[in-house]
Structures are given as C-alpha cells and as structure tokens.
Curated annotation (Swiss-Prot):
Its cofactor is (R)-lipoate. The gene is gcvH. The glycine cleavage system is composed of four proteins: P, T, L and H. This is Glycine cleavage system H protein. It comes from Clostridium botulinum (strain ATCC 19397 / Type A). Belongs to the GcvH family. The keyword Nucleotidyltransferase does not apply.
C-alpha cells in the first residue's frame, strides 16, 4: 500500500494535490484496494459548485458502489475524462489518475485534511483488519 508524502488525505480515502488555488482530487491506493476492480466512474460536471462533504463522484467496482466526497469547497474546473473509457486506471495508478480538479473557494479547509504520516497509520490499521 502506497501513501504519497506530497498529498493530503481524507478519512473517506480521497487524496488532494494542491497547485496554487486549484486542487486535484482522486482516491487513494488504500481505497482502490478496498474497492477491488473498478468498472465505472460517474464524474461531476465542469462548472459544478460543490461544497465540502458533498458527493462529487460515484465509483463502482465488482464489490460495491462508493460515493466520493469533496474534501474542499469550490467549482469543478476540470474532470479526468479518461476515466469514462478506462475506469480501471484508478486501480492501476490511483495517484496519477485524478478524478476532478476544483478551484477552491476556501483554502483554509485544507487544514482539516489528514497529513500523509497519519493517513498511512490509518491504512495500516485497515490492512490488519482485512
């Protein structure tokens, strides 16, 4: 299981990569391992305004359908259309295969996200339980 040190994380297993006022959001390696083979991703629409905590994508796997929750508030400025044709990219490269990019409306919300070293411990505990 991989946790990247240049990202922030949520308790729902989304990752956030910040570039100025834009945040790229995807699911973690821990999430894709729990979901197993991903077969469909319902993406948000560009220009959608989404508040922190709202569902912004749905990921379906052979095991389950899982909502992804927006870690920060803002407006969707970009979506990863590759996932429409190749949802398994989230399994193959969870940190390279972002789901959406958002123009953040409140960067202070980033302070509530989980640091990599803490998130790694959370995932290790989940691995022990599995």
């Amino acid at each position: 299981m991989k946790v990247l040190n240049n990202l922030l994380y949520t308790g729902d297993h989304e990752w956030v990569r910040v570039e100025d006022n834009k945040a790229y959001i995807g699911i973690s390696d821990c999430a894709q391992r729990m979901l197993s083979d991903i077969v469909f991703v319902e993406l948000p629409e560009v220009d959608d305004e989404i508040a922190k905590g709202e569902t912004f994508a749905t990921i379906e796997s052979v095991k389950a359908a899982s909502d992804s929750y927006m870690p920060v508030s803002g407006t969707i400025v970009e979506i990863n259309e590759e996932l429409e044709d190749n949802p398994a990219a989230l399994n193959e490269d969870p940190y390279g295969s972002w789901i959406a990019a958002i123009e953040m409306s409140d960067k202070s919300e980033l302070e509530e996200l989980i640091k990599p070293e803490v998130y790694e411990k959370i995932c290790e505990e989940l691995d022990k339980e599995a």
